[in-house]
Design a protein with these regions (language model features):
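Large, well-folded core regions of big proteins
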Residues: 1-223
């Protein structure tokens, strides 16, 4: 799980050897990404697979962006091809976004979040999803994060204030590999973007307490 190791230096005091090991693991993960990238810039879930993973593609981009911010070198063609694919898939119609599958708006919101994190927000896509008024808490958080990253904190706050943010226990091992804990960890990031540090700290403490007894997936650790 290389993603959590990108930020490990900021979270813990590590020995020189531990830092070197973490950096090595991140660099090797970056090198392996080519095995997963398809010709159109998307990423598959398994090396050599001809099919792309919707969530996995956004996750790969998220990893590359955070790694670059942390000082790791990301091959320009790798991330540029990813961006071109994300951009091509980011402007969907309201009809498609209103599909009943819970994972569809969530995956779409994550794509918009990563584009905003990359510094190239898709305003049309964000506004389309905003109009859908999804009741999915995680989708709202990701969209709020996209607006916050793009300088529209007022819109981000309005999304979070639409109703109570409920986190029912769940685990998804197919569509977006998530859980209620992963979703709450993502909310911590959004709250920090909105400078709601006390709320973020309170939620983070709850997550940490739960981590003492539960097994965490890669997604949960990374978020």
């Amino acid at each position: 799980a290389a993603f959590p190791q990108i930020l490990i230096n900021d979270l813990f005091e590590l020995t020189t050897k531990q830092k070197e090991e973490a950096n090595y693991n991140v660099q090797k993960a970056i090198e392996k990404l080519r095995l997963f990238q398809l010709a159109d810039g998307s990423f598959s879930y398994w090396p050599g697979s001809p099919s792309y993973s919707d969530w996995g593609t956004s996750y790969a981009g998220h990893f590359m962006i955070e790694a670059r911010k942390a000082g790791f070198r990301i091959p320009e063609d790798l991330i540029q091809n990813w961006y071109k694919f994300q951009k091509s898939k980011s402007n969907l119609s309201l009809k498609i976004l209103k599909q009943t599958e819970y994972w569809y708006p969530t995956n779409y919101a994550y794509r918009l979040y990563t584009l905003a994190l990359y510094g190239k927000p898709d305003w049309s896509g964000m506004n389309q999803l905003f109009l859908v008024k999804t009741e999915n808490t995680f989708s709202k958080m990701l969209l709020a994060g996209a607006y916050a990253l793009s300088g529209k904190k007022d819109i981000a706050e309005s999304l979070l204030n639409q109703g109570p943010l409920e986190f029912k226990a769940y685990r998804d091992d197919f569509y977006n590999f998530g859980s209620d804990i992963r979703d709450q960890a993502m909310l911590v990031q959004v709250l920090v973007l909105l400078e709601k540090n006390q709320e973020a700290l309170g939620l983070l403490n709850k997550i940490i307490k739960k981590s003492n007894s539960d097994y965490y997936s890669t997604q949960e650790q990374a978020m």
